[in-house]
Amino acid sequence: MHDMKKLDNLKHLDKGAPEAMKAFWAFDKAAFAEGALTGQVKQLIAIGVALTTQCPYCIEIHTKAARDAGATDAMLAEATLVAAAIRAGGAVTHGAHCF
C-alpha cells in the first residue's frame, strides 16, 4: 500500500524549496506543540483527519505518536468512528444539493 521509506524523498522538497519547507516544518512543529490541547489530543485529531483524507503515511505516523502519548485502543477506536461519522455526515448533508 505504501512504503514509509518514500518519505525520505521529502529531502528533495527541502532542497528544491528550502525556505518554504523550513516554514512548513516550523509550522508543523508549532501546530503539534502542547498548548490548550494536549499532544495526545492533537494526535487523535490528526488521526481523524488522516483517516478522512485517507493518507496512509499520516495514519501510521500519527497513530504511533498518539500511542507514544498514551492513547489507548479505545481512544483510537473513538477517533476512527468520529472520522467515519464526519465523512458520512458530509455525504448526507451534501445530499441536500440534490433537491
Q: Where are the model-predicted features located?
A:
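Acidic, glycine/proline-rich low-complexity segments that act as flexible tails and inter-domain linkers
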Residues: 1-43, 67, 93-99
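Short cysteine clusters
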Residues: 55-58
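C-terminal structural segments of small proteins and small subunits
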Residues: 72-99
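Immediate flanking context of iron-sulfur cluster ligation sites
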Residues: 35-53, 74-81
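Iron-sulfur (Fe-S) cluster-binding segments and ferredoxin-like electron-carrier domains
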Residues: 19-21, 60-75
